[in-house]
Amino acid sequence: MPKKRKTRGKKHSAKQKEEEVNSVVSPGIAKNDEGAGNDEGAYQVNRYTNEPVQPFFGALDPEEEKYFQQAEQAFANHFTRENEDTRFFVDSIYREVQGKELIVCNNVFGSKVLEKLFPLSTSRQIKSFFSALNGHYVELIQTTFGSYAFEKLLSHMAAILNLETQGVTEDQDDVLEGENENVFMTAETLLMYMYNEIRPEVSMLMSHKLAVHVLGKIFLLLDGYRFVYHDGNRTTMESISVPESFPQFAYSIIDSATDNLDTPELRAYCVDKYASQIMRAFIRIDFERSKKTKKKHDPRLVSKLLLSNEYDLKELPFMETLLKDETGSRILEVIVENMSASHLLRFYAVFEGRFYRLCVHPIANFIMQRYIRRLGRKEIGSVIDELKKNTDNIIRKSFLPVLRTLLEKSNHLHCYQDDIFSMIQTSVTNSGKDANIIPCLLRSKHKRDKANPENKERKLVNNLLGAQLLEEMLHCEKQHIQLLLDSVLDLSKEQILEYCLETVSSHLIEGILDLSDLNPVFLKKFLNILSGSFATLAVSAPGSHIVDKAWKATRALPLYRTRIVRELAEGGDDVKFDFYGKKVCSNWKVELFRRAPDEWYRFMKQDEPSKRVHERARQYGRIVSGSSANTQPLGEKRSTENDEELESGPKRVKV
């Protein structure tokens, strides 16, 4: 047998090292040989991209794919509401999908069509489609497009389950030709089929990149929570009614994880990028279970992780990991939000002396917000006393959300508002920039529009966190609100117009105009500043809301209302035919003012308050009682007794 040829050099030595490394495959990457990935309870991983290998269900024909591409465009352009045409279109799509549900779910165009199809479907159609996936739930949630389509389907199945649990009968819809017989099953039965199929694979799916998003929502559905999807990828979670067997199923999985996994393994899951989402669901469900029991005790899972009395939280390294880790901090947020009040003092011992450093930390500040919402009056005072020592940098960008939460809690408890305002004013004064509190907190800057690089004009950009803090200041006492109003009047007209036309800062102006007891002197000065610019504001998205708020704010100022509506009428077609301007014209009845001003004045009179302007001014000390003959409200009649006293002669009696 010939000897193996010897080789040397950097090229061959590097190749030899690579072969040695490949011979020892890491646990997260499947070895690429025969039988790799065929073990039960494991999924295949691409050795080159380190991404999970997705199951393959088949592919659509070019004609079928073109059909779903056209169906997606039809949904966007025409079939957006419930009507007869939409019903026929939905039924035709279900006939096309029948028999190839898995393939359509995992297609880029088919999944988008399904996401728009489910909200317009009947309960029978939803259950028929869901039952067609039976036996393939585990594989489907491991695919890119199928996982998103299944999330939407699960949300609609939860809505059907809620109705069936409450005893609401579904409409007797016509069964489509060839429709699955499982449509006559209840949503509870169909969902239990899915749970029983997924349960043996939970440990494998917890670390799957695509499956964890669906798996977390599945566990929360067991506990009675449904995710509602809105436009713009926004989701909200609402409580629903579920059968009694659902929470017990979730409790059994959590108890199994608590008993079979030791503490280091559970903590490793908490800081894992994907498994932490499932751990958050487990912790939330475990807290819900403990609240339902008569004997209040800490959940077993959370006690094993962190809250056991055996642990010294101040010296526990895992506590520091949760505070500073981007993934683990979300776990700690759920714990702080739901833990019993007896643990607040233990956490206070951990945070004492570190409040400022944790509040300005880019990750720990989210935990501090949750913690501050749980504190009482005494603890809030201790936090503020510690923060007073660092008032120079208290308006830092990373500190603004904590400052807003602190002010919100102070408004709720009606305490320490003066201290917070004094800290903010001191920090603004020491910043060395503009002494006005509004531009300082908004961190106003002029930047070029990235969406339109050719446009060299710079647009105003404001900080959202600072705007939220300023909006929270509007819920404080009158003397604090007056400081904010004075800061608005100190701005130039150009600055105020820029703030009105910018999306973030316009909400602050709306909040000011929406105040129930707004100072009439400030309102007149502010409207005088905006005079001549209402037509410009009406044709912009942020400014149109401000013009609409001005209608309510000027209820007691008919002269200012007339000026504004006249200015809108003089705007002509530029305002009338603009997308936002026509809505403003409709709210202000501009067309009625053009055609029949007398009728518009009568319409305005109907909206006038019973309390007159000078009565509101008297509340602010502007008019002294008895200093003028006009202090008497116009709506009241003179007293007859006073008239009799003023008469010089006796009454004439008719005989």
From Swiss-Prot:
GO terms for molecular function: RNA binding. Pumilio repeats lie at residues 96-131, 132-170, 260-303, 314-348, 349-385, 490-528, 529-566. Residues 1-14 have a biased composition (Basic residues). InterPro entries: ARM-like, ARM-type_fold, NOP9, Pumilio_RNA-bd_rpt. It is found in: Nucleus, Nucleolus. Gene3D superfamilies: Leucine-rich Repeat Variant. Residues 1-41, 612-655 are annotated as: Disordered. GO terms for biological process: endonucleolytic cleavage in 5'-ETS of tricistronic rRNA transcript (SSU-rRNA, 5.8S rRNA, LSU-rRNA); endonucleolytic cleavage in ITS1 to separate SSU-rRNA from 5.8S rRNA and LSU-rRNA from tricistronic rRNA transcript (SSU-rRNA, 5.8S rRNA, LSU-rRNA); endonucleolytic cleavage to generate mature 5'-end of SSU-rRNA from (SSU-rRNA, 5.8S rRNA, LSU-rRNA); ribosomal small subunit export from nucleus. Belongs to the NOP9 family. This is Nucleolar protein 9. It comes from Schizosaccharomyces pombe (strain 972 / ATCC 24843).
